[in-house]
């Protein structure tokens, strides 16, 4: 049986994380799912694996809560379940940046979809004629597995270092169209808002991250694989473990 893997997140106010944790843990356990769900006052971030039927049943229940009705999901498959346990964890942030003023729920930076980005990369410029630079917001060890060709990589060890790296290197970005990207979209969403907040113009986030880019385009302009935080370790542009 092929295992279905999903990744999804949403920035949305969650004042009831303790109760939500109990409900989601119970539902996931009942369906035999494995993986991790992170809950914080700012939203939800999840990585789950199981049978296709169980995954869809879980998502139906999740989307029955109006706060998650429009949550977008990225799918892949594997021969085995890449997680050993099912954990629902409470965190201060679903992706730690240590900048509480960055609240994606209050307003996102502009995004670029996979097909538009593929066209920009082929052209070498955006639709307004500006040079496009790809900014990798991931940790250095993730970048080493694969990244977009000629992407900017500041060799950060954790996402909390990103704001200082932007301030130090912002001259590299001035006058260009900057597309921030990450695995599934969550880090690049916060990164793009931060760059806008400090006055960098023409900033976009890659909608759905690398995984959605692979899913929709097959990965043109990307060299290598995409590191993932589970037992598969990395996925190729066909979303298969390498």
Swiss-Prot record:
CDD domains per the UniProt record, alphabetical: RHOD_YceA
A GO molecular-function annotation: oxidoreductase activity, acting on paired donors, with incorporation or reduction of molecular oxygen
Annotated signal peptide: none
Active site positions, chain numbering: 182
Record EC number: 1.14.-.-
Function of the protein: Catalyzes oxygen-dependent 5-hydroxyuridine (ho5U) modification at position 34 in tRNAs.
NCBIfam families in the cross-refs: PRK05320.1 (NF003703)
Name of the protein in question: tRNA uridine(34) hydroxylase
Lineage per the UniProt record: Bacteria, Pseudomonadati, Pseudomonadota, Betaproteobacteria, Burkholderiales
């Amino acid at each position: 049986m092929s295992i279905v893997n999903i990744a999804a997140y949403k920035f949305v106010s969650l004042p009831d994380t303790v109760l939500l944790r109990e409900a989601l843990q119970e539902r996931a356990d009942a369906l035999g799912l494995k993986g991790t769900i992170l809950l914080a006052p700012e939203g939800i971030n999840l990585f789950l694996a199981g049978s296709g039927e169980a995954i869809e049943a879980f998502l139906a229940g999740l989307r029955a809560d109006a706060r998650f009705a429009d949550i977008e999901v990225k799918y892949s498959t594997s021969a085995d379940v890449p997680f050993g346990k099912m954990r629902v964890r409470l965190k201060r942030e679903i992706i730690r940046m240590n900048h509480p003023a960055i609240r994606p729920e209050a307003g996102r930076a502009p995004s670029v979809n996979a097909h538009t980005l593929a066209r920009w990369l082929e052209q070498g410029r955006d639709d307004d004629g500006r040079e496009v630079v790809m900014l990798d917001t991931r940790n250095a060890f993730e970048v080493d597995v694969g990244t977009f060709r000629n992407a900017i990589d500041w060799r950060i060890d954790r996402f909390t270092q990103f704001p200082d790296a932007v301030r130090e290197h912002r001259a590299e970005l001035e006058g260009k169209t900057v597309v921030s990207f990450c695995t599934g979209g969550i880090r690049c969403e916060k990164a793009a808002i931060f760059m806008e907040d400090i006055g960098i113009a023409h900033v976009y986030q890659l909608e759905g991250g690398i995984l959605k880019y692979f899913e929709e385009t097959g990965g043109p302009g990307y060299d290598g694989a995409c590191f993932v935080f589970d037992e598969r370790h990395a996925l190729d542009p066909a979303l298969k473990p390498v």
